[in-house]
């Protein structure tokens, strides 16, 4: 693809992600309820929500998920995200670096993320069709602490100029074996089923980002870019974030990041209770950044951290291990899903 067209597509994605943003997500967190504890017997200051993701220690179990890069406009956004990550103590993931692997002129639009967050956790990001050499280059480009490999079959098939060949597992296994940083395999809004998770485990994957349905919808975005816009029947394709979390509970050796439709601290708390080590948000953060400014978005994410501590205090849980022991009440729809999929709930 012509590189200027690739950069234009990145700008399109940014604009369309905001166009299709909805304040109410369809990730199904509203179909889960905690049981209130009137006597928690802890104080707010007792709560320690630090977490571990593979060898990485995170003081905050929230992260800024992969969004963008590849054009001057998106380079500015990445600089803002880097500063927000530094101010909030949150990990941050780059958008796909594919364009920067082909065109050196695009590299600064990604390195602005690290330049503005020199001491924080930064995750590189490439597609699953790339080889080990590309993976190492992406990590080196950002001095990254981990690499995300995104699997985005649904997006590619709807994208007019997208890939049509999806022999990815060998690439993923080779990269996991060759890299000296953790490798996270990431969906981009369509969720993961236990069959997928089993395949990933078989090639050595230990960390996954479930990327469930409910947040940014790349079928909607790519279909909008088609002349006929004829693939709208796929706009509900995939497993929700909550369904994906139940799928992942069948694979206890995998460590999970939950993303997809995280709109508030209560969503994050529910995801952590279902087993996620870290919870990520992209669309909500991008929406705040576009509609307000960097300072307001930073304040929002600091408020989320206070909110998560508040919820954990309400439940009488001082750490994430205790939070994961909380039983959640499920809607009939979720119970039905788990029963049909033979998932423990």
UniProtKB/Swiss-Prot annotation:
Keyword Ribosomal protein in annotation? no
Which residues does the annotation say bind substrate?
9-10, 155
Which GO terms are recorded in the biological process aspect for this UniProt protein?
A: isoprenoid biosynthetic process
Q: Pfam families this protein is in?
A: FMN_dh
What enzyme class is recorded for this protein? isomerase
Origin, by domain of life?
Answer: Bacteria
Q: Which UniProt keyword terms apply here?
A: Cytoplasm, Flavoprotein, FMN, Isomerase, Isoprene biosynthesis, Magnesium, Metal-binding, NADP
Q: Which NCBIfam families match?
A: IPP_isom_2
GO MF annotations, alphabetized: FMN binding; isopentenyl-diphosphate delta-isomerase activity; magnesium ion binding; NADPH binding; oxidoreductase activity
Location relative to the cell: Cytoplasm
Keyword Flavoprotein set for record: yes
Where Mg(2+) binds, per the record, is at 156
Name the InterPro entries for this protein.
Aldolase_TIM, FMN-dep_DH, IPdP_isomerase
| Gene3D superfamilies noted in UniProt | Aldolase class I (3.20.20.70)
Binding-site residues for FMN, renumbered to this chain: 66-68, 96, 125, 186, 216, 261-263, 282-283
Q: What does this protein do?
A: Involved in the biosynthesis of isoprenoids. Catalyzes the 1,3-allylic rearrangement of the homoallylic substrate isopentenyl (IPP) to its allylic isomer, dimethylallyl diphosphate (DMAPP).
Output this protein's name. Isopentenyl-diphosphate delta-isomerase
Q: How does this protein assemble?
A: Homooctamer. Dimer of tetramers.
Q: What EC number(s) would the UniProt record show? A: 5.3.3.2
Report the main location listed first in the record. Answer: cytoplasm
Family, per entry: Belongs to the IPP isomerase type 2 family.
Cofactors, names only: FMN; NADPH; Mg(2+)
Catalytic reactions on record: isopentenyl diphosphate = dimethylallyl diphosphate
